[in-house]
């Protein structure tokens, strides 16, 4: 049967932790309410249980091969931009620069998984580690049938984020200006970001099998006024 698919794209954590234990993560500043803080995702959701919005939900466990594939997808695109091989952009080709390969981070992957386990397609408010701030890209795909091929899901998500390059102004590489339409791309190629970790969940929503992907990035990119990556 032919599958019906839809895509929804957003902007710019798996061992159980007993809720009786004090959460080891620090809260994050609430920028909308100075002096207040947001509770960390791992403290809000102290177990790996799926949230009540996860109708017929299941966690998609990433194998070591899946993790390496996520790195491959990201690092091939980062290398392409670094070499000056990206001709797309709203103001011309992207400049070559220094963009190193990403490594996998189990901690931020666990935080990403804990968040997608809630089956809520929006960004969590507090996901930083003790070492770094953490950025995030989200992707959601729906189908009339269950999606079983994890590599296809991962390919679609990373390629969707990167495709925003066509709208990215190359002048923002040296002095970053956040745009909702290109925030995924800039996080994928952000030069100071060194690690990535992702989580996936599948659940049923409005008759569709919905797969949600969250990839967390450390240190976070998309710093307004910062350098996306050093140009050559």
UniProtKB/Swiss-Prot annotation:
Disulfide bonds join 28-43, 54-119, 198-215. One of its GO terms (cellular component) is extracellular region. It is found in: Secreted. Its main location: secreted. Residues 71-217 form the SCP domain. Expressed by the venom gland. Pfam families: CAP. InterPro entries: Allrgn_V5/Tpx1_CS, CAP_dom, CAP_sf, CRISP-related, V5_allergen-like. Residues 1-23 form the signal peptide. Gene3D superfamilies: CAP. Keywords: Allergen, Disulfide bond, Secreted, Signal. Coiled coil: none annotated. Belongs to the CRISP family. Venom allergen 5-like subfamily. This is Venom allergen 5. It comes from Microctonus hyperodae. The lineage of its organism: Eukaryota, Metazoa, Ecdysozoa, Arthropoda, Hexapoda.
